[in-house]
Amino acid sequence: MAHTLGLTQPNSTEPHKISFTAKEIDVIEWKGDILVVGVTEKDLAKDGNSKFENPILSKVDAHLSGLLAQVSSEEDFTGKPGQSTVLRLPGLGSKRIALIGLGQSVSSPVAFHSLGEAVATVSKASQSTSAAIVLASSVSDESKLSSVSALASGIVLGLFEDGRYKSESKKPSLKAVDIIGFGTGAEVEKKLKYAEDVSYGVIFGRELINSPANVLTPAVLAEEAAKVASTYSDVFTANILNEEQCKELKMGSYLAVAAASANPPHFIHLVYKPPNGSVKTKLALVGKGLTFDSGGYNIKTGPGCSIELMKFDMGGSAAVLGAAKAIGEIKPPGVEVHFIVAACENMISGTGMRPGDVITASNGKTIEVNNTDAEGRLTLADALVYACNQGVDKIVDLATLTGACVIALGTSMAGIYTPSDELAKEVIAASERSGEKLWRMPLEESYWEMMKSGVADMVNTGGRAGGSITAALFLKQFVSEKVQWMHIDMAGPVWNEKKKSGTGFGVATLVEWVQKNSSS
């Protein structure tokens, strides 16, 4: 990697690895640093003698001569969501026992993922190297596999801290986790491996988002994509197009955005093909790849513009490339997947596009640029045309596209836009299995009136009213009617302001969706 502005280089770090083991043992017999018990409010019910009615809590409490009941009462632990207490009590094989509140019940992937994050939190706080997790209430047989996957994912992601740009960083101490009461055997082990593969894909996505724009230029993003392909060269090929090659493909919309930057654009195309068997379905995942967005001549100014966070404007590409990494590990059969990113910067210079310019996309449609800060859709336009030309059956694009979607849905969920009910059902089901939140928004065709231009086929933004919808309608102009297509506006959930970190949102849903379209 060449020297960057400020001479900044990230510390080379590998993701922290954890050994997961599924066990069916008596919790009293477990030996290690911290035993974590997930507890609902109902589990804490006591009989007339102030003894726990729950079998697991009763057994542990009896082994501790009533200390667990006594201390949990003194700590005012009621099992409410997010509540936790860590106790150091003599008499168990574990050095500590932690009670984690689950509320009324725990059943959804989101709830189990949150429990996993809580396990990570108490393990870090106690500097434990080994942990076990068990629920006071048993898990239903039909939900054990999905639950164990979400739990493991929560632990891996909960332990993640990005210390690459700190002069001193500390790695988590947790190395081994035993998961008790969720079953054992090949199916459980497969689910645990799947959870790890997806989680490390999410972490890769987070690291891409967190990388500052003076480090993660379009060229470096392309390098990172090429590394994924070379790591899994048995199933991946990479084609990185330079500016001249993009000109030959008439990508005028994409290149107009890139024109102002000293860092040239790089168009990324990875292709996954299964190692064995025939291909039944061809998919494309298209991610917005603005490694920095100044807004161009419509520069981002004023309170709330968050220009300092515009390194995350490549969050869509982070989701796509994180999914590529996970799919390289999982190797789903029967499905071919194209990963496409039009990477560039939106900067200001004498060579940049101006408000009022008319540009031409690779499908021949002309666009009047009435706002240079509505640039993501211009890059996606040519990326979507390119994706359709690969002969794919379905396309999902992801982008931090509009503030309007954040106003509508907040920061916990993304909006989805598609004319296909079938595709909507597929992707929403995948998001529910992965624990990510999506909400289907309308594609109101009458709003296209706001996108009409007097001098070109369309303008690139229709104003504030219905802004996320008109943005999706704009993208629709560059997708073949023969291809099922969905747009995901992930501007809200791309960033966790409390943790000051990218989330890797979208990776898990994309992998689940690809899996569902495979023949596995």
Swiss-Prot record:
Mn(2+) 2 binds at residues 293, 373, 375. GO terms for biological process: cellular response to heat; proteolysis. Its main location: cytoplasm. Optimum pH is 8.5 for leucine aminopeptidase activity. Binds 2 Mn(2+) ions per subunit. NCBIfam families: PRK00913.2-3 (NF002076). HAMAP family: Cytosol_peptidase_M17. This is Leucine aminopeptidase 1. It comes from Arabidopsis thaliana. The lineage of its organism: Eukaryota, Viridiplantae, Streptophyta, Embryophyta, Tracheophyta.
